[in-house]
Amino acid sequence: MYVAGVSFQQDTMPVLVHRKLEVNHKPPAVKEIVKHLIQVLNPKLHLYLFPVRRNPGYLKFTISLHLFLAHINCIHYSTSKLPSSSTLSSAKRSSISRNSSSSSLSDITMNSSESLPITLSLLSSNIACFLAFSFAFCLAV
């Protein structure tokens, strides 16, 4: 089972939209499908997979799609080093970024409660992207 969700945050008030999906594909196949959908939909829409627990033959992942301000690229952290809260704060202040095309889908990043704020003007277009993603993802599985 996989959980797909988009995390929006405007100022300090988060608006969360989650959709649970039952998936019968093994994780690598799902990663490839979702990676392709993200590239097609919106380069500002970034994908994160969080392993939650191991099931027989499958992994349960939380797919968290974080939407960022147009001038900020997403911040990735490798699975070997989970960031502390002070690391996250300094990373946000300095706007450290890395090109999403060179990053691995298995990278672990900040969770939805620590996502960066997004402007209201971008919110409506991002909701449309999420709905398109959900529809395409359901068709793919």
From Swiss-Prot:
Record key words, sorted: Allergen, Membrane, Transmembrane, Transmembrane helix
Subcellular location as annotated: Membrane
Spans through the membrane: 118-140
This protein's GO CC annotations: membrane
Disulfides per UniProt: none
Domain of life: Eukaryota
Membrane topology term: Single-pass membrane protein
Name used for this protein in its record: Allergen Cop c 5
Organism: Coprinus comatus
Lineage: Eukaryota, Fungi, Dikarya, Basidiomycota, Agaricomycotina
